[in-house]
Amino acid sequence: MIDNIWYKPQLGILSYILSPIAFIFSKIAHNRKIRLQNNQYKSKIPVIIVGNISVGGTGKTPVVRMFANQYLEQGKKPVIISRGYGAKAEKYPFEVDSKTPASVCGDEPAMLFDALGGKVPIVISPHRVDSVKYIEKNYPDADVIISDDGLQHYKLARTKEVVVVDASRMFGNGLCLPAGPLREPVERLKSVDQIIAIGNLDNQNYSELLNYNSNIVRAKIKATKFVNLVTKQSILIDSFYGKSIDAVAGIGNPDKFFSSLDELGVNIYHEHIFRDHHKYTPKDFEHFDPEQIVIMTYKDAIKCKDFAKSNWWYLDIALEFC
């Protein structure tokens, strides 16, 4: 896979060949940024962008969930906007509700709505400004708009920018697409308000981040409980210690999920890896042993709940600051 090339210690020959294109890409991205910033839409409601400068999963959605919960605990009214990757809504902006399947609104919005108990309005649209205008009209008393991703959506003015970094992978070879994993040059970090580094941030990587920004928060993803897809029963995190299970992951970085299960002492009999944003059907599980316990990510569970078996569980997680 191309991301394996991006994250190799040495610059691979393919990345070297693509580096001129990456240079052109970064220049185009920079010019686009300036053009859009000159005609930004500024909302009266504060906007917090939770994004990243690299492609793939860095942990943005758990951060969005954490921010939303914090505002709820403070008695405030947050609203979330999202691109809704893979969404098939009939019209946009589209507001998610309890009956909206992930196939209509996208994986992350469906998961966030479920995780937050429907207490936070979630609006999706390919054009975030349209979502903001929808919120201004329908939720004029909202205290804050949290954008799940959208750092590069410069048409929308923002009050605060938070960049999420995978502390274990950092920025790979440091090149922009397509030669590397970066959407923007790493120097972009100099202008953001905060960096949240998720995972094991060693001294070398911490020093690298300090070259660009001093407001760095260390965090880790903590497993909190297992939840049954059918009954919604929650059980303790050590409930499957020493037990053999099938693990299912259709996320940007499945190894993280498998490592989490390993750390919990779960014996993974088989790792089933699907593409990120995979649209599950019962056929995907026809070859599974019906007696074997299945554990998947929350994001996958949202798409499997309609045909789940009684021995299917998902691992719930939370962000914990170090």
Swiss-Prot record:
Q: Report whether Lipid biosynthesis shows up as a keyword of the record.
A: yes
Q: What is its EC number?
A: 2.7.1.130
Task: Identify the residues that bind ATP.
Answer: 54-61
Pfam families the UniProt entry points to: LpxK (PF02606)
**What species does this protein belong to?**
Francisella philomiragia subsp. philomiragia (strain ATCC 25017 / CCUG 19701 / FSC 153 / O#319-036)
Question: Per its database record, what is this protein's job?
Answer: Transfers the gamma-phosphate of ATP to the 4'-position of a tetraacyldisaccharide 1-phosphate intermediate (termed DS-1-P) to form tetraacyldisaccharide 1,4'-bis-phosphate (lipid IVA).
Name of the protein in question: Tetraacyldisaccharide 4'-kinase
Q: Name one GO biological process term.
A: lipid A biosynthetic process
Q: Which family, according to UniProt?
A: Belongs to the LpxK family.
